[in-house]
């Protein structure tokens, strides 16, 4: 390039994204991993006056005998520095400062060829020209940052402290005043102008860094301590309820139940400790599916000890395999555009897995349209059958059955015609049934019958109120996912009642399986623990206009419906569907103690895993992917824990 005259004003800039340690690690928070290298070169030699901008300690002779300067700059300054060199507007969200050394490499910042001849007589005119240009660039740079500060302060919930904002504003006003004075002195800016603009930019960068990237270790320690104390208290209450249950149930054989508790907490510990690995967070659905399959294989092995494999264990294992394939689809980056996960009435099944023998035939064309309808019809039949056989009150039975059937009819209507009124009717019916459940519950209308029968009816009515809304938000994958959820739940309950531990009214392993199944369904339905993993299209099913509260509620139900709402409200089935021989004559106190154990254990499992998520985020707070990976995972788990606690409290008010 030195020999090419027309390239003398060319600048070459090469920058890496980040570096790595000597052993190849490149994702952590050490200086070796987060720092990078920037190489800037131009064929044109700098005037001696401009070379004085570079500190003497940073420059020296290279291997080729030419002068090479090595300095440092904040990565925050890169975007605005390149924008200044290219002569394009500064990015609005950038709060960096144009780097003086990088800016000095550009001949356009000090070249005198367009200035009067008198400038050529002064050797220092290059430096004066550069100072004038650099001060002008910093003025625009500061104006852009100040505009961002004002916009952020006006829209942010937290914002910056008022004292800090007042100080930053004062620095900006002083710099602007000096710049205005310098413009009135025949283009002779003083060093003070550059210094004051630099002070303003550096001061705000420090303030922003302290507010956005520096963490309060004391508050983090307090929060983590609260988590640990709550878990200890949770364990104490669980053990207390376990002891009371044994006393009321006249149990003398406790070893088998304790063995289940140890195995369940071993699985919880394996999953929780795995959160300390960023690789696990990226494959959480697969690992949860693996742990769930481990419990199924263990149940089959236990059956083999008695010489017979139970059909529900085989069905459960087959379902887990099917769920694994669904997780692979849901966790793929193409999930957002996967037709299986769409919301409209078009094709919702990926036909690539079908043999080429069937491609082009009517069967392949009709399958995506027919199969969701067939499964939806099957779900409506099962709902009608179990509601009529479980709920004894004729009035409640009629209302719930008609409401559920109408909801399924509106879902089918929406898929066939895309009429927006159909989803709205589903939402109204679901909300009405939910409110009606609580009203009838506290009026005493649902208090008839034995305790087990009453709890079973309450749980079935509650699940029937929520299922259609969650189903329509999931799209045409909804019927298949809900059917898988029902069959898997039946397998878990059957395994609890017919396994080795027939005397246990509350199976810890069954609760653990219930929790793992909920996690698997979350990922199978195409959700991610990232903000771009939210299925925003679900929030507009039935609506064309955007309303913040309405769309937020629908998006929230779509995200947490299949993984939190349905699993938690259906937990009473683990207690109320025992063997027929053991269900008769069960004391009411024992039943509610067992139900309390189930909810305590489910909440404890969620609390332990969330605690390790918090610990992982605290450890990885300086990681390169902290905002892209760990922070979203923390947000999802924290909201999931809060929702779990709220739903458990609602369940306690509703079922007890």
Language-model region placement:
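Short, solvent-exposed loop/turn and secondary-structure capping segments
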Residues: 24-27, 50-51, 94
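Phosphate/adenylate-binding glycine loop and adjacent helical scaffold
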Residues: 99, 103-231, 268-269, 320-325, ...
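Alpha-helical transmembrane segments of integral membrane proteins
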Residues: 213-656
């Amino acid at each position: 390039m030195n020999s090419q005259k027309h390239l003398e004003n060319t600048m070459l800039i090469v920058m890496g994204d980040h570096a790595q340690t000597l052993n190849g690690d490149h994702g952590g928070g050490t200086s070796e991993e987060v720092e990078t290298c920037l190489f800037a070169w131009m064929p044109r030699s700098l005037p001696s006056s401009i070379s004085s901008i570079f500190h003497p300690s940073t420059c020296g002779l290279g291997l080729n005998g030419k002068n090479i300067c090595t300095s440092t700059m904040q990565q925050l300054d890169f975007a605005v520095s390149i924008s200044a060199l290219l002569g394009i507007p500064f990015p609005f969200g950038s709060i960096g400062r144009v780097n003086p050394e990088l800016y000095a490499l550009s001949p356009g910042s000090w070249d005198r060829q367009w200035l009067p001849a008198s400038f050529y007589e002064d050797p220092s005119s290059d430096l004066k020209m550069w100072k004038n240009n650099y001060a002008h660039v910093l003025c625009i740079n500061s104006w852009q940052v100040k505009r961002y500060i004002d916009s952020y302060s006006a829209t942010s919930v937290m914002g910056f402290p008022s004292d800090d904002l007042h100080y930053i504003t004062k620095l900006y006003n002083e710099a602007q005043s000096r710049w205005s004075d310098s413009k009135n002195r025949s283009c002779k800016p003083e060093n003070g102008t550059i210094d004051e603009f630099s002070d303003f930019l550096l001061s705000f960068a420090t303030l922003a860094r302290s507010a956005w990237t520096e963490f309060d270790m004391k508050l983090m320690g307090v929060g983590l301590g609260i988590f640990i104390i709550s878990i200890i208290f949770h364990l104490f209450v669980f053990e207390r309820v376990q002891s009371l249950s044994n006393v009321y149930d006249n149990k003398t054989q406790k070893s088998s139940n304790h063995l289940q508790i140890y195995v369940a907490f071993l699985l919880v510990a394996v999953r929780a400790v795995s959160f300390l690995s960023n690789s696990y967070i990226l494959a959480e659905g697969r690992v949860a599916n693996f742990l769930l399959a481990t419990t199924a294989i263990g149940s089959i092995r236990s059956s083999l000890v008695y010489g017979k494999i139970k059909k529900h264990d085989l069905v459960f294992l087959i379902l887990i395999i099917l769920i694994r394939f669904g997780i692979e689809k849901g966790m793929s980056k193409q999930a957002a555009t996967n037709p299986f996960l769409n919301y409209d009435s078009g094709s919702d099944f990926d036909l690539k897995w079908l043999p080429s023998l069937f491609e082009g035939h009517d069967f392949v064309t009709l399958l995506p349209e027919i199969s969701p309808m067939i499964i939806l019809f099957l779900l409506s039949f099962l709902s009608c059958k179990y509601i009529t056989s479980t709920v004894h009150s004729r009035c409640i039975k009629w209302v719930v059955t008609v409401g559920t059937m109408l909801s399924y009819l509106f879902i089918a209507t929406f898929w066939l015609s895309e009429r927006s009124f159909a989803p709205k009717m589903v939402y109204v019916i679901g909300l009405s049934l939910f409110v009606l459940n609580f009203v009838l519950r506290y009026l005493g209308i649902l208090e008839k019958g034995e305790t087990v029968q009453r709890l079973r009816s309450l749980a079935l009515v509650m699940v029937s109120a929520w299922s259609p809304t969650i189903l329509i938000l999931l799209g045409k994958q909804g019927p298949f996912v809900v059917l898988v959820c029902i069959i898997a739940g039946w397998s878990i309950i059957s395994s609890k009642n017919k396994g080795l531990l027939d005397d246990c009214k509350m199976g810890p392993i069954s609760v653990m399986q219930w929790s793992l199944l909920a996690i698997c369904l979350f990922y199978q339905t195409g959700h991610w623990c990232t903000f771009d993993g939210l299925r925003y299209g679900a929030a507009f099913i039935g609506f064309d206009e955007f309303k913040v509260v309405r769309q937020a509620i629908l998006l929230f139900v779509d995200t947490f419906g299949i993984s939190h709402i349905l699993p938690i409200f259906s937990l009473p089935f683990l207690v109320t569907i025992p063997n027929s021989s053991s269900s008769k004559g069960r004391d009411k106190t024992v039943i509610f103690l067992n139900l309390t154990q189930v909810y305590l254990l489910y909440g404890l499992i969620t609390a332990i895993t969330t605690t390790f998520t918090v610990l992982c985020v605290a450890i990885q707070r300086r990681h390169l992917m902290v905002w892209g990976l760990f922070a979203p995972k923390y947000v999802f788990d924290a909201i999931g824990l809060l929702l779990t606690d709220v739903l458990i409290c609602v369940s306690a008010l509703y079922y007890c």
